[in-house]
Amino acid sequence: SGRGKNCGGACNSNPCSCGNDCKCGAGCNCDRCSSCHCSNDDCKCGSQCTGSGSCKCGSACGCK
């Protein structure tokens, strides 16, 4: 675990240990890995999610 599926380059060369929700840039940022968040109906869940680990979007973002 640790390589963000949407991350590349320097991030995957020195991957996060928090799963697939890391945010890349100058470094790997795992501050949102433990929460579910939505962006234009594209959700990502972290370690606090249950089940399949997918999100439901809309008026509220939640894990399903």
From Swiss-Prot:
Coiled-coil positions: none
Binding site for Cu(+) 3: C18, C22, C24, C33
Residue numbers binding Cu(+) 6: C45, C57, C61, C63
Binding-site list for Cu(+) 4: C36, C49, C55, C63
Binding site for Cu(+) 2: C11, C16, C30, C33
Record: residues binding Cu(+) 5: C38, C43, C45, C49
GO MF annotation: an example: metal ion binding
Residues that bear N-acetylserine: S1
UniProt KW keywords: Acetylation, Cadmium, Copper, Metal-binding, Metal-thiolate cluster
Signal peptide: none
Annotated residues for binding of Cu(+) 1: C7, C11, C24, C28
UniProt keyword annotation of Acetylation present: yes
InterPro entries: Metalthion_mollusc
Comment, domains: 14 cysteine residues are arranged in C-X-C groups. These are thought to be the metal-binding sites in other metallothioneins.
Function: The metallothioneins are involved in the cellular sequestration of toxic metal ions and regulation of essential trace elements. This isoform binds exclusively copper.
Similarity section: Belongs to the metallothionein superfamily. Type 2 family.
Protein's name in the database: Copper-metallothionein
Lineage of the species this protein comes from: Eukaryota, Metazoa, Spiralia, Lophotrochozoa, Mollusca
